[in-house]
Curated annotation (Swiss-Prot):
The lineage of its organism: Bacteria, Bacillati, Cyanobacteriota, Cyanophyceae, Nostocales. SUPFAM superfamilies: Glyceraldehyde-3-phosphate dehydrogenase-like, C-terminal domain, NAD(P)-binding Rossmann-fold domains. Its EC number is 1.2.1.59. This is Glyceraldehyde-3-phosphate dehydrogenase 2. It catalyses: D-glyceraldehyde 3-phosphate + phosphate + NADP(+) = (2R)-3-phospho-glyceroyl phosphate + NADPH + H(+); D-glyceraldehyde 3-phosphate + phosphate + NAD(+) = (2R)-3-phospho-glyceroyl phosphate + NADH + H(+). SMART domains: Gp_dh_N (SM00846). Gap2 has a major role in carbon fixation as a component of the Calvin cycle. Catalyzes the oxidative phosphorylation of glyceraldehyde 3-phosphate (G3P) to 1,3-bisphosphoglycerate (BPG) using the cofactor NADP. The first reaction step involves the formation of a hemiacetal intermediate between G3P and a cysteine residue, and this hemiacetal intermediate is then oxidized to a thioester, with concomitant reduction of NADP to NADPH. The reduced NADPH is then exchanged with the second NAD, and the thioester is attacked by a nucleophilic inorganic phosphate to produce BPG. Homotetramer. The keyword tRNA-binding does not apply. One of its GO terms (cellular component) is cytoplasm.
Amino acid sequence: MIRVAINGFGRIGRNFARCWLGRENTNIELVAVNDTSDPRTNAHLLKYDSMLGKLKNVDITADDNSITVNGKTIKCVSDRNPENLPWKEWEIDLIIEATGVFVSKEGATKHINAGAKKVLITAPGKNEDGTFVMGVNHHDYDHNLHNIISNASCTTNCLAPIAKVLNDKFGIIKGSMTTTHSYTGDQRLLDASHRDLRRARAAAINIVPTSTGAAKAVALVIPELKGKLNGVALRVPTPNVSMVDFVVQVEKRTITEEVNQALKDASEGPLKGILDYSELQLVSSDYQGTDASSIVDANLTLVMGNDLVKVMAWYDNEWGYSQRVLDLAELVAEKWV
């Protein structure tokens, strides 16, 4: 079992903690949290969540220096500079880097300098040792080579399993993606300054077009797709659950039924638990709290001219993604030597 600390107790940090609390027989131990908020505030936000509801059957208390969950003490510290954190003293093995700030190798290395052994970035990284999407390229993780790793983005985690199935089965020539994405904390509640003039506009009353590197990032986990994919995002006035609209030109001629069958087979086989498949007539709120990275909405699959394929898939961009962060952390623990 390895000792884990969370840096940044925001949406992903707290979702990760809840995932960890709910998982049996995990091989990681959550021992510390670094966040700018105080332990009592963080304990309250962990217990009461607008999306996830109240954390039931869990006793949570806090004091000036820790949060206690069912008798288990999680140490708390508050320092914006990772190099000042007591990771060596607390014998921390792995940092879950969830601030969205220290996403570069240079930034994440500050945790290593403070005594941690490895860092898992919960966002697209910059010059990291490796990016891994569970179910797609997680088998490439090498304990001896990969000390600063990225779990990619929630959208890449939704898109990559579908891209893998379509590329393996039909061969992707090129493609584009649009994610209809719930608003996030990076946007403004009311109009206010932002480096992205569209994200500067009120999130809860606008459809906000913005950039995303999620499609290009697929090439980090499926190298043969480098230069073949791109995409955009539409941030919409919902607090959680998003949807990918993926359109590709394929080499092998096909029909809608064959595409859906390939996706269904993958969801029941090699990608079980990562990719899900649904023929139900559902809407976004029905997928709140879904563990899978990607849920194909089979009724929306289209094929035009036997070579233009459109697949749409839901994803819980907080909970589903946090489950994959935990999966990757457990993989790191499994490979620890």
